[in-house]
Amino acid sequence: MKNGDTISLSTRLTIEKQAAVTYFSEDTPMETTEELNALLASIEEEVSSETPVYLHLPAVTYDGDIVFGNHVWGIYGSSDGDDVTTFTGTVSLRGLNGNYAEMSGIQFKGNSGIGVNAYCLTLLSKCGFNGWDTAAIANNEAWVNAMDCTFTNNKIALKFNSSMAYGTAPNYLNNTFTGNGTAVCIENLPGNEVLDFAGSTFSENDVDIDNKAEHSVDTAKANFETASE
């Protein structure tokens, strides 16, 4: 090679479209807990765990526990007048090896127990939680994120008890925590990300943030309201 010689380099980029399956309540029976469980069982048998699954749920109430298995999930609620997609039992998300779940537009109404039991990265948006012992918990290898959600009258609203996670989402924006025993309980949480509660409101909770793990938390742009006398 001499000075002034030109070297040409090239790369080949291969983009593969990832297949996904989508179910709409207008086309697929999912009006009852039994129908939804039957659908989930068929998905586990027939759909690869590498295939994302998107569910558009009707505005009905599902009683009993529901388990979403090892997939990337998009689970979307709906409304019809005063009716909203609602779960009254524990919803478990069990994605493995990087599979995660997104849930949006759903109400979780309980009188004890756990609302969302996450074993994978779980992203909650525009959801409501009322009446649970623990509204949403991140178990080991999991992370729970919430944005634009309401947590009312739960013993614990958000709980973290995870020593590792396949994904993180540290922005907890525009949530409302009202009348909970503990709004946010951090027992164990991996990583160094700062949990940002900008735009979130804490009102009339016995404890706003119980940070046992001493994880970094930013509440500078959160709102803290006390009960009026």
What is each model feature region?
Residues 1-3:
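A short beta-strand micro-motif common to beta-rich folds, especially ectodomain repeats
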Residues 74-77, 100-104, 122-126, 143-147, ...:
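All-beta strand scaffolds that present successive hydrophobic residues in beta-strands
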